[in-house]
């Protein structure tokens, strides 16, 4: 058993069932998970929780900005945070994401997302 703290993942998703599924998959993989329902709420969470190590966000959300814009803002404020962006409606190009950001198309397997976050945060076996 590892003594290192669990990686905290912020999941940003406005669809409750998708949010619950993503959170459950990440929790099952050993991550601590918190949620936000839009970009503005995500930025509040990011400010409240300096221990957040990864953000997994949907692209299409209500509010002032979408998930790609959120990814850029998060990277500006916290370049140490791993960023994954997801969508089933559009394909996000690498050039649209901040440095190091990744795109995962919906539908996705929760285990795949958990493995990717583990690799990118250096906690491949959370």
Residue spans of the language-model regions?
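Non-catalytic signal-transmission and effector/linker regions of two-component phosphorelay proteins
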Residues: 1-10, 16-17, 76, 80, ...
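Two-component/phosphorelay signaling modules centered on CheY-like receiver
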Residues: 16-34
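Acidic, metal-coordinating helix/loop segments flanking the phosphotransfer/catalytic sites
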Residues: 35-54
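Acidic catalytic/metal-coordinating carboxylates
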Residues: 38, 65-70
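Short amphipathic alpha-helix used as the core "switch/output" element in two-component signaling
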Residues: 44, 68-80
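Active-site residues of response regulator receiver
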Residues: 58-59
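Hydrophobic/aromatic residues positioned on beta-strands within the core alpha/beta folds
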Residues: 86-87
